């Protein structure tokens, strides 16, 4: 819990340290996997490298564990929740390509054949990630010469 509190309070260095201490105690468990995710999120916020390797170690450990009996439990990490964590880490780190790949996977895996969203909060955040990526992709196109018109608070074509 110390790592999670530090992470949510913006104390990222302390979150990394707490996650590493917790991982030393919670070896080969879902808690260990969740602490890897928290460490990765904190390191992404700090701009540190090595996130893909760290996430791969969490995925490998998760794959060795049996599927949780109650995946809806916040503290039980399952493969779908792990992909959501990975999406979040890559989004924070600015790796839009991987973030969008994970977001698409999470939406697919959390939507039933009849269209019911199994994890609405997760799906919503993934949609925000995809929308943000699309917005950036559109804004960065070479033909987009629109510049903010501060006088009118809108976009206008550049005349220069």
Predicted regions and their residues:
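Conserved binding/catalytic microenvironments
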Residues: 1-160
């Amino acid at each position: 819990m110390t790592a999670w509190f530090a992470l949510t309070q913006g104390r990222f260095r302390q979150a990394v340290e707490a996650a590493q201490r917790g991982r030393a105690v919670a070896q080969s468990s879902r808690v260990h996997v969740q602490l890897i995710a928290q460490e990765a999120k904190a390191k992404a916020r700090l701009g540190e490298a090595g996130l893909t390797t760290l996430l791969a170690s969490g995925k490998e450990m998760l794959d060795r564990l049996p599927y949780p009996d109650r995946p809806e439990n916040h503290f039980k990490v399952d493969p779908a929740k792990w992909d959501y964590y990975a999406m979040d880490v890559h989004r924070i780190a600015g790796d839009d390509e991987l973030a969008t790949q994970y977001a698409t996977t999470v939406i697919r895996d959390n939507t039933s054949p009849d269209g019911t969203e199994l994890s609405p909060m997760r799906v919503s955040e993934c949609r925000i990630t995809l929308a943000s990526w699309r917005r950036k992709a559109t804004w960065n196109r070479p033909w987009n010469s629109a510049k903010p018109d501060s006088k009118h608070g809108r976009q206008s074509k550049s005349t220069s």
